[in-house]
């Protein structure tokens, strides 16, 4: 036998929805902090890449001078030194290219994550509105029921029903908005998942 559903059950649902709102807001804030950290990481990585490029320019200058000296048999420069430096330059060029792709992937991800957090907050706000209106419509229903039990006259009864219908209409509108916000939230989350895949694919060996 199914339990009897009471008005209190729906009021409890509204209270629980408010708890979900609170947790959504907390998660959004935590994700904002993480986004800021990822932005800072990308910024520091870009600075390191710039230094690496400057290092390569210096290495190329050294090699150019070494190659000039190699023409002199009595110079203290060996072919092995030049070859080793050339290998370092070649590897550094590869690291710069890989890191640039990685930095771009992080930037794209953080931009989408900012939009995702925005949609999460909109979802939370819409859910909060639904919880408020759910509670209001139930309390209004209880009030109307109480008045009906007092056998109020016809005109007052019509007014009570009209008032309740207004509350119900407000709730229905809020719920429609919530459903729309949930769909938007899920859509952006799927887009974010795709960007995580791109970020993962951009990771390669980099010293």
Locate the predicted segments by residue.
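Short, low-to-moderate order helix/coil transition modules at the start of elongated helical scaffolds
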Residues: 1-207
């Amino acid at each position: 036998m199914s339990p009897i559903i009471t008005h209190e059950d729906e009021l409890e649902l509204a209270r629980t929805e408010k708890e979900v709102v609170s947790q959504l807001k907390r998660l959004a804030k935590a994700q904002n902090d993480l986004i800021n950290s990822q932005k800072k990481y990308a910024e520091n990585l870009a600075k390191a890449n710039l230094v690496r490029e400057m290092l390569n320019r210096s290495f190329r200058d050294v090699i150019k001078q070494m190659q000039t000296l190699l023409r002199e048999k009595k110079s203290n420069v060996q072919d092995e030194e030049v070859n080793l430096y050339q290998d370092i330059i070649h590897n550094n060029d590869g690291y710069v290219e890989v890191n640039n792709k990685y930095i771009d992937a992080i930037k794209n991800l953080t931009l989408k994550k900012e939009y995702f957090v925005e949609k999460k907050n909109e979802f939370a706000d819409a859910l909060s509105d639904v919880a408020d209106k759910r509670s209001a419509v139930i309390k209004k229903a209880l009030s109307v029921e109480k008045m009906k039990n007092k056998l109020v006259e016809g005109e007052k009864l019509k007014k009570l029903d009209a008032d309740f219908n207004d509350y119900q209409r407000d709730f229905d509108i809020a719920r429609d908005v919530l459903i729309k916000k949930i769909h938007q939230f899920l859509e952006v989350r799927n887009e974010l998942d795709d960007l995580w895949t791109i970020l993962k694919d951009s990771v390669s060996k980099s010293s």
